[in-house]
């Protein structure tokens, strides 16, 4: 039995419209796997969001539990970013010809999942570790600038939030400079705005001079104990 033209057209339409939806949903679900929350449950039978700043991110995890299980947080958040970008790159970038915009599309929904995870009552992290990993996967030049800005400001001021905000702000400009593509730049701008919105309370504290600085410590406090 042969394949009729209308069947081919229907299949093409399903792929054309179904692939972006599937990538968006899967990337979002991958983003929902929060490394800080999962690791605090696995290692300490606790929820990192109950302590410190209440944020489900690496900084708050480290401040409350120390360095022993921090690599697990990093692994969780890096692997989900890799998975999302691979999905976007293959199904959108390669099969549908979106190019690098396919990776940016998946990255956006991964960040949304990280910040608003359906598994954890839509209360997630601020997206820095996840976004930082995505930078490495999207383009090494953008990653070099973003990570460079973050490291320079963090090391000189000890404000993780300041480095994060500045790196996020540079992202859409670097995206446009490298790719000169309106769609890709728009997606990059959406990611940056999400990260900046997530850091709105940090920005207020930076402006008022009440933001906490980040310092390394060797000994962790008791599991679940606020600092």
Task: Give residue spans per PLM region.
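Helix-coil boundary and interhelical linker segments in multi-pass alpha-helical membrane proteins
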Residues: 1-22, 85-105, 136-142, 176-187
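Hydrophobic alpha-helical transmembrane segments
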Residues: 17, 21-25, 71, 103-108, ...
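N-terminal signal-anchor transmembrane alpha helix
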Residues: 18-43
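C-terminal ends of transmembrane helices
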Residues: 36-40, 59-60, 113-123, 150-157, ...
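Cytosolic, membrane-interface loops and tails of multi-pass inner-membrane proteins
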Residues: 37-70, 204-227
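Short, non-helical or kinked segments that cap or interrupt transmembrane helices
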Residues: 46-58, 119-132, 159-167
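Interfacial segments of multi-pass membrane proteins
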Residues: 60-66, 88-92, 109, 113, ...
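Multi-pass membrane catalytic core of lipid/isoprenoid biosynthesis enzymes
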Residues: 63-89
